[in-house]
Amino acid sequence: MKKMDYQNVRGTQDYLPEQEVTRRAIRRTLEDTFMAYGCKPLETPILNYTELMASKYAGGAEILQEMYTLTDRGERDLALRYDLTIPFAKVVAMNPAISMPFKRYEIGKVFRDGPIKAGRFREFTQCDVDIVGVASQAAEAELMMMAIDAFDKLNLQINIQYNNRKLLVGLLQLFEVEQEQMNRVILILDKMEKIDQKTMLTELQELGISSNSINKIKQFLEERTQINMAYFNEYANENMLLQQGLQELMELTAYLNTLELSEQCIFNPFLARGLEIYTGTIYEIFLADEIIRSSIGSGGRYDQAIGGLLGSEQSYATVGISFGLDVIYTALELSGKIERNTPIADIYIIPIGTEKAALKLAAELRRKEYKVEVELSGKKVKKAMEKANRENTQKVIVLGEDEVTHNMYKIKEMQSGKEELVAFEF
């Protein structure tokens, strides 16, 4: 018989208990923060129709190339979700009775057949919050504040860079970039931190962008150190879309100043976020210490997606933010901020021929909300105590027949060595 290949699929991994304890603690911290902001939990299917995930309101051509697709026995074209945004938009589209504004969070696995790097896998856990029904920049400000709160609780300091898609598109319109080339140009600009300016300009030439437009883009890039929000005032009267984007940015900045978040939330006029789904504010989250240089979270406003899925022109004011749980874990690990050997059980009971009595005692202790493990494999006391020390268990009970006969047990605090005799009716 051929030996089975026990390796994990490339881009996937197992999380052993020591890792999973930390991952679940991260998840609880995020969930507690999300709920503190009034967000409601939601769960959506991993498996979706390809048509939904590939719609023009979905992830764009670059992500669609990474989509896992399959055909079921009914020959239906299906896909594994690559994010939580489109499944959420589908839920809102299918449930018109949902009360607005609707704030939801979802933490779940998503799949992308993309490149693998630190904290980036092909099966990974995404943590999303989205708000439907708030047109003002108050929604963006609250999500950015929530992100800072969440990462503070995780002992990670972050910066959030933000921009506005309308500002960027309006500027490119003034640079005479053709509408059908717009998103491909934005995708190239989105790679600014990864490629040099010469390579970027070459890619624009290969795309067929006119030399006039390229020269204007080049000048814009060369002035990057001098560009702030006021820079765009002179263009505001020349392009309505740019004007709207600038107004939204000023509104958001006013909120951030009031919330005293302006030091951590930084306007970046070159932030592009190449996904076509975005219609307004966009932002990306970075670690302040740059222990991971790529973004660890992102989001933005996508007012057309829900209406688009419904096949209507109606706009649904929607904005979201997303964090990767796996990259958060990697950041904590690289920063040395993960507590190792966290005990699972509060009390470890070692029976010496008294398994039935040990299970009865454990049941009573659990009713008192202790986490209790009973040694059931027949380990000798010495080996069992070594396990208790190795797993950093706080308290141990060695339960022999004499203790059961006398209706008492001795509980030992492992750190101090202190022992206490406790009566119990076996």
Where are these regions (language model features)?
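Generic N-terminal leader/targeting and pre-domain segments
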Residues: 3, 28-38, 43, 58
